[in-house]
Amino acid sequence: CEESQRVCTAFRQIGHEAYSCDVQECSGGHPEWHIQGDVLPYIDGSCIVTTMDGVEHRIDGTWDLLIAHPPCTYLSNAGARHLWKGHVLNQERYEKGLEGKAFFMRFLSADCPRICVENPVPSRIYELPKYTQTIQPYEYGHPYSKRTCLWLKNLPPLQPTDIVDPVGTWCPSGSYSHKHDAKHKGIFTKD
């Protein structure tokens, strides 16, 4: 999940040859840096990638750094409440979670010297490896809380750069808290 190209663009701005990859088209304005499709054929490097502008790029050897944002729909602790319906395991959702775990683990085991995998707090049922650290938006100048986990390989932990007081939880429009009527406003967010 890197269709926004925020990470890719940040690395390009400081001189790195970075690419984004997602099954969706990019929204960051740089199709010449975006590989649209499944990341798995390219994850270990030693490949030829074609960016959205139709240009082929040869990757010799492994990537220098892999930053991954795999889908969290079935893995996150927030989604765990959907696993049990009337005290019965939702088998379909559980199996989708196992597929999500296999995808997640492919990033952690990629042939790459430096790896960062980002995801929300995982549900314990899937037994993901222990994350290296957690970060919060308010540690980087954004006045919201949303605990995010990082699994790091050969990378130092991130250090806060601009700690501010959080004004509420980060919760985009259309998320759980916005599906309730006005009496629930403010319980999950400050909006």
Residue ranges and their predicted role:
Residues 1-191:
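Conserved active-site and SAM-binding loop architecture
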